[in-house]
Each structure stands twice: as C-alpha cells, then as structure tokens.
C-alpha cells in the first residue's frame, strides 16, 4: 500500500501551551487534525468557562492565516474548589467539552490538582447528570508506590471506587500505558473509553535508556515493559470502539528536557499520523487506523464525524533534529530518524 486516505482525524489529548510556545506549535496540529481536545494545565490553570473562552481565542489567533480549519475543543482543570454550577456553564457553553482530573503533583503543572475526589463528589455528580466527560490522568501520587505501578494502583484504588459511586459518569482514561488499563477499558461499559499516544504503542521503557539516558523519551505516565506496550497495541488495533487517538503531544524547550531535573513530555505533533500509521502497520491493522483516528473519538464525545480527508503516503523521510520553539528549540519524537509514512501534500 503506497497511499492511505482517512476521514480527517482529531486529536483527543493535546498540549498547546500559550504565548510564544503556542505560536510555535499550533500549526503542526492544525495540519493533521480538524479538532483537538486542549489540555488546561497552563500557569495558572484554566479552571472556568470564562478562562477557557479567552484561551480558545488565543489558540485561534495563533493559527497561521489561510491554513486548514482547526477547532480547539476546550477543557477545564478540575480542582478541589470547582463548583457544580461551573458544570452547568460547561454544558451550556458549546465549546468546553470536558473536565480534566490531575491528581495533585502527578505531572506537568498539576500542583493545583485534586487532593481528594470525595471533596469533588457534588461536582462529579453534576457531571454525571449532564453527561460531561471526566478526563483522567490515571496515576496515584503516593511516593511509596513504584512509579511503574501507579496507573494500575489508580484503577484499583481510585477509579473503580469512583465508578461504583457514579456508574454513569463518562470517563476517558488518558494516555493509558498498561495491560491492566487496556483490560479495564475492554471490560467496562460504554461510558468508559481511553486515549492512546504514539509513543505508548511504539516504545517500551528500554527506549529511555538505549545508549544512555534519553530525556526526550521521558513522559508521564512513563513508558512501561514490553508486555504492556504489546497489550496496548493489541487493544487499540482490536477493533474496539473504546480507544481513540490522543497524542498527548507536549512541547518543552530543549534545555528544560536536557536538565538535571528534566520535564516530562514528548512532542509528536510534527508527525502524529505517520507515527500511528507505523504502529498500525506493525500490527498488521492499517485498515483499523481510520476508526481509531477519525470515528471513535467523535462518537464518544457525541460530536459529528469530520467530512474532509487526509492522505498519507508510504515514503520515507527524516525527522528534523530540532524545531523552533520561541527563542529556543524543541526536540521532536524520532528526531534525526527515518519515518516510513508522511502526509501527502
């Protein structure tokens, strides 16, 4: 197969940052995707519909003039103090589509995250009543729990009790990384879904250490053993409608990654579709890429599927060693390496 044409896809988990960083990266996503669920973990975080409206305008202003149409789908950052009334405003807004749960301290800019779900129960109950999805960074932050086990422990100790309390809450497990998460979603009712990144389909934790410490392969949740990567790939390419594309593309300046205490996050927006195509091709499931990239997400979010198309061609190209990022540079996933697929045109 030399070309592959897909209904124009969406990215259901994206970090666009703000200011100069936003201006540097927005066009990459707009080139490949019609829409994206935009993460709210700015400094300060986006916690209200009013703040989300202002951020949405900044995103639209950062898109290159004359470029492809791109719709940012906004989210709010759930805090211990998010009132149920804000959920009503979300449901009425037409442009805020979900709330994001960051356990406090779990990832980049998560200090304002939730310290106890029990304190959020009235707000979560209102979300369940109105059908507003909760997007979950599914890791516990207890320092006694091994970093490689934090997703599995989260499912057992946080997510399952929450769903026992609120069984109709619509939940997206973001960037799943473990066999346990894949099995949980496959066995769960239709109100539970998951996004999957290209790196968690393509790489295991060896990629962090091959030839030395590889900071540009460090993200959270961290890459796992090969058995988990393989389980994720099997689930995603199985034909289940409960898994959909979410890059978690997360730009950081090169100096912030190559540091004594480097930031977590992998930038993949420059080549997201080629990376996913490689993963699906490796699994012998290219015929299932379109549903994962273009159908399952809008169906879960109760949004119309896109009508345009994008075409990939199977032609090798070399990923640049770095990309401009304001006054700095960033190192993209597969920097300096060869990819098999690229966007046509």
UniProtKB/Swiss-Prot annotation:
UniProt cofactor note: Binds 2 Zn(2+) ions per subunit.
One GO cellular component term: cytoplasm
Domain of life per record: Bacteria
UniProt cross-references to Gene3D superfamilies, sorted A to Z: Metal-dependent hydrolases
Pfam families the UniProt entry points to: Amidohydro_1 (PF01979)
Residue numbers annotated as active site: 248
The protein's annotated pathway: Pyrimidine metabolism; UMP biosynthesis via de novo pathway; (S)-dihydroorotate from bicarbonate: step 3/3
EC number: 3.5.2.3
Cofactor(s) required, per the database record: Zn(2+)
Chain residues that bind Zn(2+) 1: 13, 15, 100, 248
Catalysis performed (reactions): (S)-dihydroorotate + H2O = N-carbamoyl-L-aspartate + H(+)
InterPro entries noted in UniProt: Amidohydro-rel, DHOdimr, Dihydroorotase_CS, Metal_Hydrolase
Keywords, sorted A to Z: Hydrolase, Metal-binding, Pyrimidine biosynthesis, Zinc
Residues that hold substrate according to the record: 15-17, 41, 137, 220, 252, 264
Single Gene Ontology BP annotation: 'de novo' UMP biosynthetic process
Gene Ontology MF terms: dihydroorotase activity; zinc ion binding
Similarity-based family: Belongs to the metallo-dependent hydrolases superfamily. DHOase family. Class II DHOase subfamily.
Name of this chain's protein: Dihydroorotase
Record lineage: Bacteria, Pseudomonadati, Pseudomonadota, Betaproteobacteria, Neisseriales
Encoding gene per record: pyrC
